[in-house]
Structure formats: C-alpha cells, structure tokens
Amino acid sequence: YFAPQTWTSDDTDASERTKIQYGTSYVYPIVSMGSHVSAVPNHQLYRTTPIETRANVAYFGTFGYELDLNLLSDAEMASVKKQIAFMKEYRELIQVDGDFYRLLSPFEGNETAWMVVSQDKTQAVAALYQRLNKVNASWLRLKLEGLDPDAKYQVSCDLTPSSSFDTELVKRYGYDTVGNQVKTYEAYGDELMRAGIPVDRQDLNKKGGDF
C-alpha cells in the first residue's frame, strides 16, 4: 500500500530536511512528502535558518507553513508572499508534471542540489543549498540533468539576499541587501548539463551565509 502523502519526519529543520527528502526521493515521489516551513529556532535542533531556505527546501514536497504568521517580521511576510506566488506558478511542474533529478548529495559534501524538469523538457526548476559557509571557497558549477541538449533555455538565478540578512550591522559592512536580485542569461541544454551554471560563493553569501 502506498499512501498518497506521508510525514517523513518530525524534524523540520531545513538543513536536516535536505538529507531526509533526498533519501526519501529514492523510494517515493516528492509529491508524497509532507514538507513545511516551520518556526525558528527549530523545535528539535534549536537552529535558526532563513525563511527563504526553509521554503526553498519545502517547495520540493507538498509545501505548507507550520508557524505563527503573526510573529514574522514585515520582511519575512514579504518573503512568504513571494514564496506562495512562486509555488502557485510552479506547483504543477514540481508536483505533477516534472521528473525529479538528484544533482548533489547532502551525504557526500557541503552542498545539496536537485531539480525538476517538465515532460516536454521546456521548463525546469533547480535548487542549490549550502550547509556551511567557508572562507575563500572556490566557485562551483551546478551541472543540470534531463534537459534537451539542443534547446536554448532562459536561465534565471535568484540571488536575492535573505530577509534575515538585511540588518544594520550587515549594511554597515557594505553588503548589498536591497531588493530582488535575479541574474538572467541564455544557454543551451548541453552547456547547462556539461559545463553547468557557474556559482560565485559571494552570491551564496548574499543569501545569508550558512544554510
């Protein structure tokens, strides 16, 4: 018997969930995994992760919120609205139509990555997660899978800083934390799969550093 939906774990910490959901995906489709944006500090690990990271992990499951919205800051509420709009736009791709690909294993390194590709290979959503920030870490290339090698794709990389990163202390040191920051360019499928998407560690730092 296969349940249409299951609660994979009471552990809703975003960093831990990359392992939980990555491993579960070997046996069950991601649409069957209950995945929520929960409160921080996490009730089990007492770890605080940005609300953007929690959503970015929860997207690849059923997606929902498990927290008191009244306790969120204005910046976090703005992020929630953006997250809901994103999920409405891509829910069918992620939960119904798409094929799921595991790109980087959380059990083998500091990064986790996975993606979903539509059946006709015209659309895809990929996610890259960094566990811990490292000093002077080199660039990495996120190599995608499942694309049409001969198709030209419009690539959009969301580099918008985390709302939790938008503090006076951060601004004092000159980090750019203002507004939506999306990098776009065109590339063929074979380039995205063989050469990959170049990722500057400074871009990951803008997302909030750890997690």
Predicted stretch roles:
Residues 55-104:
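Catalytic cores of secreted or luminal carbohydrate-active enzymes
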Residues 106-149:
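Carbohydrate-binding surface patches
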Residues 10-20, 36, 86, 153-157, ...:
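Short, surface-exposed, polar/charged, turn-prone segments marking secondary-structure boundaries
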Residues 58, 126, 155:
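Conserved, mostly hydrophobic/aromatic
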Residues 1, 41-45, 66-68, 74-76, ...:
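Flexible loop/turn segments at secondary-structure boundaries
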Residues 132-211:
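C-terminal beta-sandwich/jelly-roll accessory domains of carbohydrate-active enzymes
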Residues 1-70:
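Glycan-recognition surfaces
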